[in-house]
Amino acid sequence: MEPTSEYTETYDYYDTGYNDSGCDYSEWEPSYSLIPVLYMLIFILGLSGNGVVIFTVWRAKSKRRAADVYIGNLALADLTFVITLPLWAVYTALGYHWPFGVALCKISSYVVLVNMYASVFCLTCLSFDRYLAIVHSLSSGRLRSRATMLASLGAIWFLSCLLAVPTLLFRTTVDDTGSNRTTCAMDFSLVTLNQDHESLWIAGLSLSSSALGFLLPFLAMTVCYCFIGCTVTRHFSHLRKEDQKKRRLLKIITTLVVVFAFCWTPFHVLKSMDALSYLDLAPNSCGFLHFLLLAHPYATCLAYVNSCLNPFLYAFFDLRFRSQCLCLLNLKKAMHGHMSSMSSTLSAQTQKSEVQSLATKV
């Protein structure tokens, strides 16, 4: 099965296109206008929201919990990713023409995949931290130490960067002389020129990224929450104040996981179905492949929405985060008022000086 020249897949990071079976893979025209607008909206909300989260976590050093550190790193991953969205917005608006060169094609694609891995790994560590704090509250002191937390953060970023390396190797710009455009796509000519082998590479990398970046971590999170649910239910009748705080934090993290699953599941399902079609393990009809082509940009957009939702979830569920944000806003107002006061004082002093100078001259 060889990729069609009509359309080069831009959303699936381990895919070069849909199978060439003589079908018409024409894109839905409104997507060229709608998708860039959605990307820029996610960019604006994600940049401001995650910036506030990072600053809030950094500022509250004395009250920082282990969960806050993971949340801060989750926001950092999302912030790094949303910075690339203007490039993808322009790319889509130009009809999938990439004008930014090979380096930005590789780097921006790499950042997208690093974000996917780092986000799900941070959520997995958050879930495991809650599992230890609630199910093994008396015996998990060493596992929840600062050194262990820093080691897990190092492992998260190392694994995320490592697992995304195939994008750096294979993602490049491809000139399409037929449509007079340059696409940012996967090119496996470094490892094979055989179309069947290329299909295996596409399917293998696509399925492995979905397994490692979604399915296995989500299963681990599900197991953690099953144990947590049993423990919380068992001790529901006599919760101490400290336990109530744990429950509030648990509610926030559970919401983050559920929203993450809601946003990313359609993307991984469509990506896996496309990968299986390369292996002839899924329908290979024109209608099915055309459905994947039309649905994939919007499934991708839904996945990207997750990067701007988390700050609003913190603000809605976490009273402490809300109060810290209000303190931040009050600090800004105070600084603005102080600057205005200084400006007024300087202006008055300047006017007084000018009057004195004029009186001297007269």
UniProtKB/Swiss-Prot annotation:
Disruption phenotype: Morpholino knockdown of the protein induces embryonic lethality due to cardiac dysplasia with little to no blood circulation around 6 days post-fertilization (dpf). Mutant embryos show pericardial edema and accumulation of erythrocytes in the intermediate cell mass (ICM) at 30 hours post-fertilization (hpf). Display decreased angioblast migration to the embryonic midline during late gastrulation.
Residues in the Extracellular compartment per record: 1-34, 95-106, 171-211, 270-284
Localization, UniProt: Cell membrane
Residues on Cytoplasmic side: 56-73, 128-149, 233-248, 306-362
One annotated GO molecular function: apelin receptor activity
InterPro entries per UniProt: ATII_rcpt, CCR1-9-like, GPCR_Rhodpsn, GPCR_Rhodpsn_7TM
Membrane topology: Multi-pass membrane protein
Pfam families linked: 7tm_1
Transmembrane segments: 35-55, 74-94, 107-127, 150-170, 212-232, 249-269, 285-305
Disulphide bond pairs: C23-C286, C105-C184
Keywords: Angiogenesis, Cell membrane, Developmental protein, Disulfide bond, G-protein coupled receptor, Gastrulation, Glycoprotein, Membrane, Receptor, Transducer, Transmembrane, Transmembrane helix
Glycosylation sites: N19, N180
GO terms (BP aspect): angioblast cell migration from lateral mesoderm to midline; blood vessel development; cardiac muscle tissue development; cell migration; cell migration involved in gastrulation; coronary vasculature development; determination of heart left/right asymmetry; determination of left/right symmetry
Tissue and organ distribution: First expressed before epiboly in dorsal precursors. During epiboly, expressed in the enveloping layer, yolk syncytial layer and migrating mesendoderm. During segmentation stages, expressed in epithelial structures such as adaxial cells, border cells of the newly formed somites, developing lens, otic vesicles and venous vasculature.
Family statement drawn from the similarity comment of this UniProt entry: Belongs to the G-protein coupled receptor 1 family.
Function: G protein-coupled receptor for peptide hormones apelin (apln) and apelin receptor early endogenous ligand (apela), that plays a role in the regulation of normal cardiovascular function and fluid homeostasis. When acting as apelin receptor, activates both G(i) protein pathway that inhibits adenylate cyclase activity, and the beta-arrestin pathway that promotes internalization of the receptor. Also functions as mechanoreceptor that is activated by pathological stimuli in a G-protein-independent fashion to induce beta-arrestin signaling, hence eliciting cardiac hypertrophy.
Name by which UniProt lists this protein: Apelin receptor A
Natural source organism: Danio rerio
